[in-house]
């Protein structure tokens, strides 16, 4: 069975009802959760927490609410994190490709998806992952 991984853009949109992509992100997330095969790269949870607690008013939520929302949604899913040696390999891979700045976070998320053997990475920002494409994880924007 091929499993889906999600990135931060899908998690934030799925959890915040006011988001313009809420319906499609929520449907994709619920589909993965219902199938029992959803993979969540660990850095996605930290980044989602960061985004949700720094949004401009009135959309910002408190740290406690962010933790509760993430916990209620993802406590029982498979979290994928890199080991120290895998982090060093990721940094070398980024350096070889001259990828810098925020691209490192996208690379970290994709590396976690690969480690979990995800067939697809669901994202609302597909273009952010295109330069990483090595054909082993399909980059997919959730359907309308």
Give short role names for the model-derived ranges.
Residues 1-40, 55-68, 143:
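Short, well-structured N-terminal submotif of metal-dependent ribonuclease cores
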Residues 2-3, 107-144:
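Acidic, PIN/NYN-like endoribonuclease modules and their adjacent C-terminal/linker elements
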Residues 6, 39-40, 81, 104, ...:
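Short beta-strand scaffold positions
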Residues 9-10, 43, 108, 127:
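Alpha-helix/helix-capping structural signal
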Residues 13-15, 51, 132:
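Residues that scaffold the ATP/ADP-binding catalytic core of kinase and kinase-like folds
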Residues 34-38, 76-78, 115-120:
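Short active-site oxyanion
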